């Protein structure tokens, strides 16, 4: 069921999203050679808790960390651990915070030091594809108007969108209806209504869109071992322009 948030609920959700966005920015600042993914996860946990919130991902369906940290060919759900970042890595950080009964959810891919031109292009196209989709976030449009815009932009740049995982509604639950694919024909799916909140999250691969899940049951990698990037914000549908609830200057 798709939930419509009232203004009182949105006040709490805006604060949850503000905390989430700040945690993403903090994680991004830590993406440097010599830093372990576990250290980034601890910083995310400490920050979220310091704000009176809870990490949305920690123990969610058994996930063992506060942030999903996915390096290079890992698309999503990377489990932080002892891996030490090195020059040239690209690092996707996905975070969520639960505050006053509501979740925020956002992600971005960061460059670790100097990266290849193609890796930077992948990051840039992934981010811009979100904003291409955002142009379709208007009252009365349909969910797959967003999907089609993202897919069209990504594929026109020679990359592929992941099919196996999609964006989603977000609110009192981390994952709510509707699903928001990053692919598909325009004009399909539920209509967008004011008060809906969506986590729009292009996951873009350098090569094939096929994925493989590792034995830990979480870590999802590209089937061909090529790079992947991720960009996500929580967005509110309004009567006019959409509102990015996890907005962060420069991200």
Regions inferred by a protein language model and the residue ranges of each:
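Active-site neighborhoods and metal-handling regions in enzymes and metal-associated proteins
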Residues: 1-251
């Amino acid at each position: 069921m798709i939930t419509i948030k009232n203004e009182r609920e949105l006040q709490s959700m805006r604060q949850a999203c503000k905390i989430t966005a700040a945690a993403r920015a903090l994680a991004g600042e830590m993406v440097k050679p010599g830093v372990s993914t576990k250290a980034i996860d601890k910083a995310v946990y400490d920050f979220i808790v310091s704000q009176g919130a809870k990490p949305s991902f920690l123990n969610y369906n058994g996930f063992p960390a506060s942030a999903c940290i996915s390096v290079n060919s890992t698309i999503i759900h990377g489990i932080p651990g002892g891996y030490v970042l090195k020059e040239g890595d690209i690092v996707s950080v996905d975070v969520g915070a639960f505050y006053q009964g509501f979740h925020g959810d956002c992600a971005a891919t960061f460059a670790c030091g100097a990266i290849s031109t193609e890796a930077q292009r992948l990051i840039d196209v992934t981010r811009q594809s979100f904003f291409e989709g955002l142009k379709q976030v208007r009252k009365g449009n349909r969910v797959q108007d967003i999907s089609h815009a993202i897919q069209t932009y990504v594929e026109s740049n020679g990359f592929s969108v992941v099919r196996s995982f999609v964006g989603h509604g977000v609110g009192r639950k981390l994952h709510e209806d509707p699903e928001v694919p990053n692919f598909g024909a325009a004009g399909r799916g539920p209509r967008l209504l004011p008060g809906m909140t969506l986590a729009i999250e292009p996951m873009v691969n350098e090569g094939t869109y096929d994925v493989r899940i590792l034995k830990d049951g979480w870590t999802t990698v590209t089937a061909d071992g090529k790079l992947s990037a991720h960009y996500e914000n929580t967005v509110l549908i309004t009567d006019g322009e959409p509102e990015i609830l996890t907005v962060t200057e420069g991200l």
